[in-house]
Amino acid sequence: MNEEFMKERPVLPLLLSMALPMILSMLVNSLYNIVDSFFVAKISEDAMTALSLVFPIQNFVNAVAIGFGVGINAVIAFYLGAKEPDKANAAASKGTLLSVVHGVIMTVVCILIMPGFLRMFTSNETVVQMGIQYSMIVFAFSVIISIDLSFEKIYQAVGRMVVTMVGLGGGCLMNIVLDPLLIFGIGPFPKMGIRGAALATGLGQVFTLLIYLFVYVFRPISVKIGRRYLHTEDYLTGKLYAIGIPAILNMALPSLLTTALNAILSTYSQIYVVILGIYYKLQTFLYLPANGMIQGMRPVISYNYGAGEHKRVRSIYNITLTIIGMIMVFGTVICLIFPDKLIGMFSDNQATITEGATALRIICAGFIGSSVSVTSSGALEGLGKGTPSLMISLLRYVVVIIPVAFVLSRIFGVVGVWNAFWVAELITAVAALFIYRQAVKRKS
């Protein structure tokens, strides 16, 4: 099998070779929402608010697709490391079919709930209607997103990171080109407003899938997808969900957090809801490189775990933690030096820029601490330990930050919400280190 390099190459060069294509592709992919926000902000402040309110549900759809993809990735890489290719093929085939099912369900559910969901956070009917227009189109592509992520994780499991980089990059470039054309009606294209932003995003995702399918057909990989594998290794469905469900919850929890914080912030002013939406778009530039490292690390740590290379597993964890810590230091410095310029990328409103700069300076105090929880949670997913990974994410996104944000907002006002971020990150970092060590010790 040509995946042997994952246990033979030195750890640092191996991690970088696996992670750098993912970091580049995820940085480019982060432009999906960034580009939408940039052009939508040119429409109106109401349009930007609508996009911010839809974001948690949009993020949930991605969470389901990515989270289940993590299960596909971990199971395939484990069986490749254990030299059981038939089981790897079955995992890929079953995982792809289940991803299609998930996409259909999410399309129906998300479109149905959006009107009521939007009215929970705003009484501005213009914002509600813009949110519905955007949602009806963007969620119609949920099946495409699910299949995209299934193929992405399969390619990652066999070490073909460049394929995912090209696929994600191609889709993003398509989105960047189509956004202004469809939003503002340039040339022969219709002027669709916020609906154009949604359609551009969906067509970009379709283009990504076409790239993946082209490579699968003309540049075959060691893992095969086929109907004949669907009726074998029935227990693998349970194994996929055993890792995938905690990973889905891990990915979905930020949406729950955003919804809860929007509810708190909306009691003060719509400006703060916009600021939170802008922050989450900005932080993608920081956390997506970190997540790119995790995506590069995950198949490597899973493969070596399946091959019984436990000392190498420890080395992979430690090196990944160090690199992610360096990324977070860089992000903290940038946010402290240029907060107003960063917020100003997405708003011309001086009040939003001023308040947003204050928020960014406070929130970034927790970036460095988050490197421990991000690395520990990702490593546990790669090792097939979904429950401990979920425990870390629950602490980070629900158990600590939401109560702290609520209490501090009652004492210090809106500034208390921003301070809740770094308080939660520091508490979670200590807990994550303990949970990771206990989970690894218990199994080894």
Predicted regions and their residues:
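Hydrophobic transmembrane alpha-helices of multi-pass small-molecule transporters
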Residues: 60-63, 107, 175-180, 209-213, ...
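Short runs within selected transmembrane alpha-helices of multi-pass transporters and secretion channels
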Residues: 69, 73, 138-156, 164-172, ...
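Transmembrane alpha-helix boundary and packing residues in multipass membrane permease domains
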Residues: 22, 26, 38, 74, ...
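Residue-level signal for short hydrophobic patches within transmembrane helices
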Residues: 8, 12-31, 35, 57-64, ...
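Transmembrane helical elements of multi-pass membrane transporters/channels
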Residues: 17-36, 137, 171, 204-208, ...
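Small-residue-rich hydrophobic transmembrane alpha-helices
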Residues: 48-108, 145-159, 163-164, 262, ...
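Helix-terminus/linker motif at the lipid-water interface of multi-pass membrane proteins
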Residues: 27, 31-49, 118-125, 181-192, ...
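Short alpha-helical transmembrane segments in multi-pass integral membrane proteins
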Residues: 1-19, 76-143, 189-245, 301-366, ...
